[in-house]
Design a protein with these regions (language model features):
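Zymogen propeptides
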Residues: 15-18, 86-206
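Sec-dependent signal peptide recognition
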Residues: 1-3
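Structural recognition of the beta-strand scaffold that forms the well-ordered cores
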Residues: 178-182, 212-214, 273, 281-283, ...
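Conserved, well-ordered active-site substructure
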Residues: 189-207, 257-311, 321-353
């Protein structure tokens, strides 16, 4: 009996054990289901692959498109501008700064150099290609200011000067001149356009003689008298205007062969030569002395002025009136010391009233 009860109890225990085990198995899938669902969401990292595509490097390629800006900086082309602006008072635009010097003027027997004026006088004897004997003087002149090249009457007016010519050395001292030549003797005539130091002395048309005009910017012009009226000359607002001539060089600076003048034979000569604004020359040729200097005719004189490199040249009064004076002394030795009614001279700049 006891054995039967034990067997029944043992059988009941065995039936409960599989039931509990089955219950345990059925419960574990229920708890694992929510935990295994989470890993199925992990595929979200796949967008990170697309993020890599965003790292397309268009930004660096856009940067070079901004770099052309340096090509828009051609500022170096503006640097030449300062060199193109000469000082207003400099007639030759600063092309010859080496001919002047600062400080006190330096003077020798044949030269004068200051901050505003440079004069060098050369004596030329028997120039090649010209009759012998021949003596001439060339005064090379640079000025910074147009007021350094002036004219003067022997007296206060043109009319008074015609009746009372003066000695060149007296006029040099009166005008405080550095260098002086005789002028055009215009007081002898009653025609021609005459301007001295900006002041009009006469306004009469002159078809017979060439005119010479010095403008305020330093330019010197020689004009045909039969093609230029006094009104046209005065319209230029000249600093000086002379009436004698003839012009010795053509518009290209070459020697003329024909002249509107009766005084074409060998004679003492006085010439105003021109190179460029601010650069001029006074030329005096000795003459009428066979054993010293015969003088030049107009063809020879024009060739001589061309040989000096002048671009324009104008014949002034000549003969015994021709004279060159420097530093209070006559440089040329004219046959006679004829008085002159007007002169052309170089001085230090002056302020005009």
């Amino acid at each position: 009996m006891m054995l039967l009860i034990c067997a029944l109890l043992l059988a009941g225990c065995n039936e409960k054990a599989p039931a509990q085990a089955a219950a345990a198995v059925t419960e574990t899938p229920e708890t694992a289901a929510p935990e295994t669902a989470a890993p199925t969401d992990v595929p979200t990292p796949t967008p990170t692959v697309e993020v890599v595509e965003i790292v397309l490097t268009p930004a660096p390629t856009a940067a070079p498109t901004d770099t052309p800006e340096p090509t828009d900086t051609p500022t170096p082309t503006d640097t030449p501008v300062p060199t193109a602006t000469p000082t207003p008072d400099c007639l030759h635009g600063g092309d010859h700064p080496d001919v002047f010097q600062t400080g006190e003027p330096v003077k020798t027997e044949t030269s004068y150099v200051s901050e505003n004026v440079c004069i060098t006088i050369q004596r030329i004897e028997d120039p090649e290609g010209f009759p012998k004997p021949m003596v001439c003087f060339v005064a090379d002149i640079y000025i910074e200011d147009i007021t350094s090249l002036r004219s003067a009457w022997s007296k206060d007016t043109l009319r008074d000067s015609a009746n009372a010519p003066g000695d060149v050395l007296d006029l040099m001292a009166r005008e405080d001149a550095l260098l002086m030549i005789n002028g055009d003797y215009v007081s002898k005539w009653n025609f021609g356009c005459v301007v001295k130091n900006g002041q009009v002395a006469r306004q009469v048309d002159n078809p017979r003689y060439d005119a010479c005009v010095l403008l305020r910017d330093g330019t010197l012009l020689t004009l045909d008298g039969d093609k230029t009226s006094s009104e046209q000359i005065l319209a230029m607002d000249p600093w000086q205007a002379w009436c004698f001539g003839p012009a010795l060089l053509d518009e290209n600076g070459h020697a003329k062969e024909t002249f509107n003048s009766s005084l074409i034979g060998p004679n003492p000569r006085t010439v105003l030569g021109y190179y460029a604004p601010g650069h001029y020359c006074f030329v005096v040729v000795e003459g009428r002395r066979d054993k010293y200097s015969k003088g030049m005719n107009l063809q020879q004189l024009s060739r001589f002025m061309e040989s000096l490199g002048c671009t324009a040249a104008y014949n002034m009064d000549g003969g015994d009136s021709s004279v060159l004076a420097f530093d209070g002394q006559r440089v040329s030795k004219p046959r006679s010391r004829r008085s002159v009614p007007d002169v052309i001279y170089i001085c230090e700049p002056r302020k005009e009233k």
